Amino acid sequence: MTGDILFLAHRRPFPPDRGDSIRSWNILNALADIAPVHLVSFGEADEAASAALAEVCASVQLIPHRRTKIGAMAASLLSGRPASVELFRSAAFAKAVSAVMAAYPVRVIYAFSGQMAQYAPTGGQGPRFVMDFTDVDSQKFASYAKAGGVSGLANRIEAARLLRFERAVAARADVSLFVSAAEEALFRRVSGLTEPATAVLENGVDLTRFCAGTWPRPQAAGDAPLIVFTGQMDYLPNIDAVTWFAHEVLPLIRDRQADARFAIVGRAPTEAVRALGALPGVIVTGEVPDTRPWLSAAQVVVAPLRIARGIQNKVLEAMASAKAVVASLEAAEGIDACHGKELLIAQTAAAQADAVLSLLHDPARRVAMEAAARAAMEARYSWAAKLAPLASYIGLDTRQVAA
């Protein structure tokens, strides 16, 4: 490929320790195998991240994120733009983008997350514009709006503004990418657009990092049957999921398995999440250096999300770790796995409790599901396989990559 790639990110891709950074880091590496990549991202510079990014990218500019949510909401009231877009509006970021465009022969702009579209030049015969929406964010806010009240009204306004923004961005992008066929279809339905090019670029999982290894059992895990949830614990869908599970599902499980414990594993737990630790059988770990020892210790991993967009990395990682997973329909959406063989899908509190107990009480079934889950990930979810279409999406024939 003649020319460079400009990669725009709303959050630093390294370390790849949460859903969006896992995807952006792997895509960044794949793009760097095709052409020189220049990264402009929000985030603070630190030695480890700077070194890792410098190994992959031809140039790196990390712009501190200073705007607050309150400031973004105020700006949104004045501008009519979505608050989630205003949150990432920055003169310093725009200046960094302009500097890269002036200094290097940029042929492709890869915008990771909708908020970054505001920095892609408009009009003229500029670089190819690839918009990686990943999820349909407007519909996430539409889900939040169902809560009602003042926050529900605010989220309903944000959902409407963001959908208008997403529609306008897709109309000018050369291709818009989504993490699953379900997200792509949802966008086409809610946007009403038929002309813009859309495509699917699914997530994979690191099959070397997440595997059926044995790690020392965390002391806090104890010796009783362990049910584990992993995730960023200041993220509303995760907060909602663990709160519902701890209050509605775990008591049903403990009625029949009195010593069962539920571990909520992830950084930045809110006060509401920390308070769950006072409930019988609930462990709240806070940030841990590595989630794999907790996955290794688990008899069952759960993903009881009621609000979810895209593909859940937490489910892929658990399955790659050869763990039996009980997931909601929302959490399992977009994942190519067979219910009853490679994971269990359950929706109501009673159904989730029954599913977890069936695995706790039938070790042979659990072991068979663990093996099937790992085999499914090996067969269908390597990052190399999932990102194979990337070259064509940036306007490069895959035969050119091979050459």
Give the positions of each predicted feature.
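Conserved catalytic-core segment of nucleotide-activated headgroup transferases in glycan assembly
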Residues: 171, 189, 195-297
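Acidic donor-binding loop of glycosyltransferase active sites
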Residues: 174, 281, 287, 296-310, ...
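A short, well-ordered alpha-helix in the C-terminal region of glycosyltransferases
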Residues: 365-380, 389
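Conserved acidic donor-binding segment of nucleotide-sugar-dependent glycosyltransferases
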Residues: 343-350, 358-363
